[in-house]
């Protein structure tokens, strides 16, 4: 073979079979449920990597995040939504509900996540919205690994299955990955023939800048008390790649509403903010695959969570 001749067999051997547009399937799957039921954990497990932050605290997810899973001819675009909840006392809560509701449009399948042990008023609210829609819904009964009595889970599932004509009722553990393969089969069955929306290597529609802000916010929730999650946000003021250091230089501004919260974030002798910064930097380096130089500041901005102008500048309105 001449040096400049293209070896098509070698190309396919190294790159795998290229999906042709006429054989492609593509569609959207909304992951919905009340706050803190495991939606982001499920998305991360399906994708095999972390794109949506998690914590034990409710309403960790504030934005609508898309995760892209491409397998040959099939591309599934998952939409992780903020938890739908009844209380809408603050502007940020109203916007989170609106972002979650707007995700329930033009989807091909819905995963409705509920807890494997109990049913709440917020679950009932989500169910009511789904009953009014025409979308096929798979009821995903999560956290079954936390229940010792198998009969208890089966009885709970039987009761919930009567609430709506579900495509299927699947017991899962988002954390352990139990029955993820069953969910994938349902996804394939509901993806229409359509050209892929994203290149094969894409995993999310969100930018690295956005992911950096979310990682810092996750560490804030992990290392601070229960009061902070609803009163803190993160704005990335600088996100630059420096070829000399072959790394990202990132400045993160942490906004809180009161001086007491600022002291809580900084900690005694600045120890807490150092821990938050260190842990965030390590996660960013793993995600971005490069060295990260992260600097963090804390600033008091009273009432930001009730100010729609401030929320718009911080990117919350863009989800609608």
Curated annotation (Swiss-Prot):
One of its GO terms (biological process) is ribosomal small subunit assembly. Its main location: cytoplasm. Residues 216-302 form the KH type-2 domain. Keywords: Cell inner membrane, Cell membrane, Cytoplasm, GTP-binding, Membrane, Nucleotide-binding, Ribosome biogenesis, RNA-binding, rRNA-binding. It is a peripheral membrane protein. Residues 59-63 are annotated as: G2. Residues 25-193 form the Era-type G domain. InterPro entries: G_ERA_dom, GTP-bd, GTPase_Era-like, KH_dom-like_a/b, KH_dom_type_2, KH_sf_prok-type, P-loop_NTPase, Small_GTP-bd. Residues 80-83 are annotated as: G3. NCBIfam families: era, PRK00089.1, small_GTP. An essential GTPase that binds both GDP and GTP, with rapid nucleotide exchange. Plays a role in 16S rRNA processing and 30S ribosomal subunit biogenesis and possibly also in cell cycle regulation and energy metabolism. This is GTPase Era. The gene is era.
């Amino acid at each position: 073979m001449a040096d400049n001749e293209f070896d098509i067999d070698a190309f396919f051997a190294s790159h795998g079979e290229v999906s042709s547009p006429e054989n492609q399937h593509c569609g959207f799957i909304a992951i919905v449920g009340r706050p803190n039921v495991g939606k982001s954990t499920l998305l991360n497990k399906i994708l095999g990597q972390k794109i949506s932050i998690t914590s034990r605290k409710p309403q960790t997810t504030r934005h609508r995040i898309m995760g892209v899973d491409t397998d040959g001819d099939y591309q599934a675009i998952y939409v992780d939504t903020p938890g739908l909840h009844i209380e809408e006392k603050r502007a940020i809560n109203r916007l989170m509900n609106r972002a979650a509701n707007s995700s329930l449009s033009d989807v091909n399948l819905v995963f409705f996540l509920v807890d494997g042990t109990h049913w709440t008023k917020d679950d009932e609210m989500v169910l009511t919205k789904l009953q009014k829609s025409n979308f096929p819904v798979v009821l995903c009964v999560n956290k079954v690994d936390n229940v010792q009595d198998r009969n208890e889970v089966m009885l709970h599932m039987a009761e919930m299955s009567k609430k709506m004509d579900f495509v299927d009722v699947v017991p899962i553990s988002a954390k352990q990955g139990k029955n993820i393969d069953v969910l994938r089969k349902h996804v394939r069955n509901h993806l229409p023939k359509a050209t892929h929306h994203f290149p094969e290597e894409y995993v999310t529609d969100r930018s690295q800048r956005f992911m950096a802000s979310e990682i810092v916010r996750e560490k804030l929730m992990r290392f601070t008390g229960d009061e902070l999650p609803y009163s803190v946000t993160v704005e990335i003021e600088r996100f630059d790649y420096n070829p000399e250091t072959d790394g990202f230089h990132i400045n993160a501004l942490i906004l809180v509403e009161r001086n007491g919260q600022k002291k809580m974030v900084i900690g005694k002798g600045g120890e807490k903010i150092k821990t938050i910064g260190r842990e965030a930097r390590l996660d960013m380096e793993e995600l971005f695959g490069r060295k990260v130089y992260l600097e963090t500041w804390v600033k008091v901005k009273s009432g930001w969570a009730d100010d729609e102008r401030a929320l718009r500048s911080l990117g919350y309105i863009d989800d609608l």
